[in-house]
Amino acid sequence: MTPLFERIETRRAWTDDERLVLDSVRRLADEVIAPGADTYDRSGDFPADNIAAITDLGLNGLFVPEAYGGNPISYRLYLACVRTISEACASTGITYATNFHGLGPLVEFGSEA
């Protein structure tokens, strides 16, 4: 992490619940995602195992309303999750971040039909 981001990070006031999410994401990034990062980056393969692990942790439901089984969080916390995952594996990070671009319009503009 660059000195600028380190300074910003020390000024953030995360709630206990947000810290729990960040700790879980950091553990996932360190233990599951980072070990295979070089392989995915070299091969160009889709990081299916990493995305499955992200899904298992519940991170793909972060912008889905609770009524539909989601676990909504702040955009700030989402960005911290994306950064942590991307630091571990750029391929996985961009794939995870792209999920929001597909999901966001569905949540925002979708109907019950």
Model-derived features with residue positions:
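Intrinsic disorder at enzyme termini
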Residues: 1-20
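Alpha-helical hairpin
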Residues: 13-14, 46, 73, 110
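A generic secondary-structure micro-motif detector
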Residues: 15, 39-41, 71
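General structural feature for long, well-ordered alpha-helical segments within catalytic domains
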Residues: 21-25, 46-50, 77, 81
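Internal helix-loop-helix
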Residues: 26, 56-112
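N-terminal capping segment at the start of a domain
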Residues: 28-38
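Short secondary-structure junction/hinge motifs that connect adjacent elements
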Residues: 36-57
